[in-house]
């Protein structure tokens, strides 16, 4: 008798399932968050105020994702009527303060805004400027990191303790029911999470089983969100790639947020560039012998969220679509329209690299590079797809 085919366990990702995921800009007050938001979104908010809580309700904007592949496809399908790039939704969340987890400084409202996003850009101030006050009195990025980390952890401990109390109530009923057994397992996991948080660690940086991830996702923990640390330098320090605080920041992140990325950038430089035409901005960067950090900041967050792209190309439109890694063809079709998912028949798939080489759909087909895939096909980053569906919907 042949051995049973092993069913591969589907990996469950931390966070909210879906393709339209959101990144929140987080940090203490007056570290450059709102100016960064204006630069990355090119959305003017007026002059960001030089005092805490200048932003109260989060601002939202969609950021175009830099994509050389999309640009190249638009050149190849240059007669297309419409070009639609991929976007990342970004929120500018008001500055946190020490004591936010206890409700100080409008803390509960701000923490609820963080809870509603899927990932975090944490902006850390590393520049000196006497005209921009620091809520803690002086510039000390490691202290600022510890404040934010502590406030998010304390709130998560509060969430976890409430979840533990709820699980305990059911577990105390006793008996051998499946629900009681599950709640006892949840209690063990939640106790483990609380100990982890009390040690200064973030939930996102720990290794969890798929079963544990499902429970963690139901708790909507703040520290379970992927985080990128944006180190806001002066223009001079960014260009020369030096700052006295960088080593200490790296040591702190390695210890308390291992595996998370640190990206140095300069809000003042990016803000200046945002007011220029693309040509003038390119000329300015050449003159300064540096590059903008924004493309890396945007694309790296998409990677942290496990987001990938597929494309649809034709005479009417070239479009880059965003999906979660591991998405199957019918669900990818559903991103375009629900009817395409419900009546899915097959997907005709080409690879970007083949389109770049052959530059013509008929030549790709003649070369045997056009593949037909069924409902179990897992879409790969860079696929160009023509979906075929029933009921006359293509």
Curated annotation (Swiss-Prot):
Keyword entries, A-Z: ATP-binding, Cytoplasm, Hydrolase, Isopeptide bond, Magnesium, Metal-binding, Nucleotide-binding, Phosphoprotein, Ubl conjugation
- Please list the residue ranges annotated as the TGS domain: 306-389
Which PROSITE patterns did the record assign?
A: G_OBG, TGS
CDD domains noted in UniProt: TGS_YchF_OLA1, YchF
Highest taxon above the source species: Eukaryota
Main location per UniProt?
Answer: cytoplasm
Crosslink Glycyl lysine isopeptide (Lys-Gly) (interchain with G-Cter in ubiquitin): position given as 98
The chain positions of domain OBG-type G read 21-285
InterPro entries with a match to the protein in the record = ATPase_YchF/OLA1, Beta-grasp_dom_sf, G_OBG, GTP-bd, P-loop_NTPase, TGS, TGS-like, TGS-like_dom_sf
Q: Which SUPFAM superfamilies match?
A: P-loop containing nucleoside triphosphate hydrolases (SSF52540), TGS-like (SSF81271)
Q: Which residues carry this modification: Phosphothreonine?
A: 89
- The entry's ATP-binding residues are 30-35, 233
GO CC, alphabetical: cytoplasm; cytoplasmic stress granule
| Subunit description | Monomer. Interacts with the 26S proteasome subunit RPT6.
The text of the family note is:
Belongs to the TRAFAC class OBG-HflX-like GTPase superfamily. OBG GTPase family. YchF/OLA1 subfamily.
Anything else known: Present with 36803 molecules/cell in log phase SD medium.
What does the UniProt function comment say about this protein?
Answer: Hydrolyzes ATP, and can also hydrolyze GTP with lower efficiency. Has lower affinity for GTP.
- Protein name (Swiss-Prot/TrEMBL): Obg-like ATPase 1
